[in-house]
């Protein structure tokens, strides 16, 4: 009776599993797991021998096609290894059939496989006598010292937490905070946040435009100039000014500190600037004074300058189900980015988000989705013998079948992009520690099947064995191995958050990172507050308009930074000297020393009891709790994301309306079609040759470059053209993120950029100020002041 009354999940009864594809996956895994291919004889085989081997392989393939996936392990004895796609590099594949004599194939045991893995990782630097004698004493000493540092770090953090709990969060202030944390939706959260701001007198902070972390004077001048040009109808000059101010972190307006002094809101001047820029962009779109080609060049230019926004979902075992709430909060507010990356468990949520439309996704992000999350359902008496036999707790074939629901069957990255317009990115790492990492997406691997990359990204040593990627062969419509020389495993071992790769492929300059890794969350500490969560300052100080303070005071913050940097230093030494043993054929030193943060980093709160369920499937009640926890963690960042995406969407609107269709690609701009500019604007105008119409544009030509019939398709493995802002020196994102993680790079980029405004902001300020001073034609303005 209970089952008949339960709410039905969208698409719950649809079986997306293609058993033929699962069988092909099983064949590739069985060959790789049971046999090793020794070195081939240098002398080539005769043509008669090759044809005989080809006939044998064809016969064996026909026999295997009649077997199920579970019968393959006993049917492969004495057969030839199937052809794989090998490569010299990521972009140079060679599909060759190698005839391998049966005498060169031998059975491979699990223990020998492990030993061989260790021998592959061992390098010549470990062979010296001094290394052999001193390695373990040094490692033991460093480990003891790190343990002591961690203990002292925990003491400092406990002191800060207790002082805030007993001395700051008391009385009505505590009641208002508890009310804020209990908000059920975003609208309710905003009202509660504003009430808390008013009680703490934080709303008055927004009224004063001056702040050391951005250039308020430049922002004021920009607003004034844009408004006057728009009202006077000087659309051409307006377009030139917009070219200079629409770019990443212009005048420091994307500094996190601007959103870290209130629970909801920022400086009113910043909000006014964003509103004015959007109005001016719409003015350029509707303008009759500006030619079509000039509009098109303008929007291509500002799109490169401003960049794209991406959502990055980290790994973290079953903590990753909190990402569902992050995605739901963004989707409900129409702020879900079109570029989403995921690693390990985060890849599952990313795949669901990119293979479904908005309407479908809203129907799936409900507690009933827990019925489809059954990866850990095997009892202990099933998985313990499996782990003892195979070295992995979970079965790859079962996970492949269960992942099909989240990927809509054997959907490829290109098919997902064509269906929803979202660009899915899954980070995978070769099982060989010295091979390059690959970010699977619609550019690098458009025909790769998503569920195979999900399994590869989830293949943590001891949890799931490395797997082979699969791709669709467009000529035969079959599934074939997509192997670039090795199997693939969990991407979080090396690149949990692939920000640099996203910038390379998609010009991503702004990243929203949802980080749930428990070994990283412990070290999250925002000494100056974070977005939507200001430092807990006593009310007596806020009423005196003293809004800046450090968590726990200067001494506590200094000790926290000292201990964290010391831990990072010694971990880096372990990695540099290669002291850590390679357990399970993997170098584990990278899991602490990556970049784990982004422009905005969300850290959902994990409770101690959550660790009990770290490798278990959620019930509907627990998934509902995780959805709510993820939403509440995202609410404080919604305003920041909204401000960023509002300009990005306005630019995209202009690009869509001015984009040339495929039938008009032969059109070129002529001098006669140029618009008239004022003398000062003419000095700053971009030369047409700088952005030629024939230049590759990642947004406008995705369909052409990634089409299955295109000559640059992945089957041909032509190197993709990434000229759309990818070769720009300043294209990479280095936001100051001293609050997050243990990365040395994160600690090096402190938030003191607010005082100096950085080289980029200075350039933008010089450009605008020089333009404003150009009242007379005698003032000479140079193109080098224009920032692109």
From Swiss-Prot:
Keyword set includes Lipid metabolism: yes
TM segment ranges: 136-156
GO cellular component: membrane
Gene3D superfamilies hit by this protein: Cytosolic phospholipase A2 catalytic domain
Active site: 344, 490
The EC number(s) this enzyme carries: 3.1.1.-
Disordered: region residues: 662-771
Reported function: Probable lipid hydrolase.
UniProt-listed SUPFAM superfamilies: FabD/lysophospholipase-like (SSF52151)
Occurrences of domain PNPLA (ranges): 311-503
Comp. bias regions, Polar residues: 662-672
Biological processes annotated in GO: lipid catabolic process; triglyceride metabolic process
Bias-annotated ranges (Acidic residues): 690-705, 723-749
Subcellular location: Membrane
Descriptive protein name: Patatin-like phospholipase domain-containing protein DEHA2B04136g
Species of origin: Debaryomyces hansenii (strain ATCC 36239 / CBS 767 / BCRC 21394 / JCM 1990 / NBRC 0083 / IGC 2968) (Yeast)
Highest rank taxon of the organism: Eukaryota
A GO MF label: triacylglycerol lipase activity
